[in-house]
Design a protein with these regions (language model features):
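Acidic, surface-exposed loops and disordered segments
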Residues: 8, 27-210
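N-terminal regions encompassing targeting/leader/pre-sequences
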Residues: 1, 24-27
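Sec-dependent N-terminal signal peptides
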Residues: 15-24
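Positively charged n-region of N-terminal signal peptides that target proteins for export
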Residues: 2-15
Length: 210
């Protein structure tokens, strides 16, 4: 009985090892673990060349945008809005409206037009609370965009925030109301290659301790 138990135990171990190996292969040779926040920070880059032929689903974009709803905003005004070009017709139309970035993002499967509602963040009863005015809305939109690009990287996607765009034509294309300011178009896709790591300014140049 003892010998039989030992044989069964050895076979079970072999099966367990085999199953683990198969799971590792199924994950592309990597463990299926979520990246840490520091890993997301370190790997996120502004990507200017995207892999052709790869798609991103609407469900994935919805998950991505849900993360932006956790971004802080002035008095929880949540002024940020997104217009998603995921269908080929709209995607092609956006490509024609982003100036010199077209060739860089031509293979990105999704574009998100980022706007914010004016007269909300930084305002109280219709009046600006200080000289900053609607810049608070732009600030909040930047925070929302930051959540978006970091969540995108955590999901294995890459992004490029583009300020170069034809705002008037984008407004017509997506029927964006006049009370929204268009700040950027964000390309979403998969990097074609790993970019070089940029040189960052020394910490003591950007922070002062007292």
């Amino acid at each position: 009985m003892t010998n039989l138990a030992e044989i069964i135990l050895k076979r079970m171990k072999k099966i367990s090892i085999l199953l683990c190996a198969l799971a590792l292969v199924a994950c592309g040779g990597h463990q299926a673990t979520s990246p840490t926040l520091d890993e997301v920070f370190a790997s996120r880059r502004s990507i200017r060349a995207y892999e052709a032929g790869k798609t991103i689903s609407e469900a994935e974009v919805r998950e991505l945008l849900t993360a932006t709803q956790n971004a802080p905003s002035w008095a929880n005004m949540q002024p940020s809005k997104y217009y998603v070009a995921i269908g080929e017709e709209k995607r092609e139309a956006v490509l024609e409206l982003i100036g010199g970035n077209k060739d860089r993002v031509i293979n990105a499967p999704v574009f998100l037009v980022s706007t914010f509602e004016t007269g909300k963040s930084g305002f109280f009863r219709g009046n600006p609370v200080d000289a900053t005015g609607d810049l608070w809305g732009a600030y909040d939109n930047g925070l929302s965009n930051a959540y978006l690009i970091l969540k995108a990287r955590a999901m294995g996607f890459d992004t490029l925030i583009m300020g170069m765009r034809n705002a008037d034509e984008l407004r017509k294309l997506f029927e964006i109301p006049d009370n929204e300011t268009i700040l950027a178009v964000i390309a979403l896709g998969y990097r074609a290659q790993d970019p070089n790591t940029p040189v960052h300014r020394p910490l003591d140049e950007i922070a002062k301790f007292y």
